[in-house]
């Protein structure tokens, strides 16, 4: 086996660009994970009947409430974390 190819040292501008790109990709991944969690939680909680082309009235209302509560709790958590960061 040959030795791994060394990565040339990056200049500061390239490092910052790479760091910014990685932060954006991590944010996208976190958003996707939140959407997956939201979908899974609300689906399992609200969809009680069989699969059909339309949600029942109660399922639609449950889904709407579930999404609202999920978003409310997510925003609350973010605000609490930001408040804790400011106290440090």
From Swiss-Prot:
Per the UniProt entry, the disulfide pairs are: 42-66, 46-62
Q: Which InterPro entries does the UniProt entry name for this protein? A: Tim10-like (IPR004217), Tim10-like_dom_sf (IPR035427)
**Topology versus the membrane:** Peripheral membrane protein
For this record, an example GO cellular component is: mitochondrial inner membrane
Q: Which SUPFAM superfamilies match?
A: Tim10-like (SSF144122)
Q: Which keywords, in A-to-Z order, does the entry hold?
A: Chaperone, Disulfide bond, Membrane, Metal-binding, Mitochondrion, Mitochondrion inner membrane, Protein transport, Translocation, Transport, Zinc
Report any Pfam family annotated for this entry: zf-Tim10_DDP
Question: Could you give a GO molecular-function term held by this entry?
Answer: metal ion binding
Biological process (GO), any one: protein transport
Q: Where is this motif: Twin CX3C motif?
A: 42-66
Q: Where in the cell is it found?
A: Mitochondrion inner membrane
> Belongs to which family?
Belongs to the small Tim family.
The text the record gives for the protein's domains is:
The twin CX3C motif contains 4 conserved Cys residues that form 2 disulfide bonds in the mitochondrial intermembrane space. However, during the transit of TIM8 from cytoplasm into mitochondrion, the Cys residues probably coordinate zinc, thereby preventing folding and allowing its transfer across mitochondrial outer membrane.
This chain belongs to the protein called Mitochondrial import inner membrane translocase subunit TIM8
From which source organism is this entry? Cryptococcus neoformans var. neoformans serotype D (strain JEC21 / ATCC MYA-565)
Q: What is the lineage of its organism?
A: Eukaryota, Fungi, Dikarya, Basidiomycota, Agaricomycotina
The gene coding this protein: TIM8
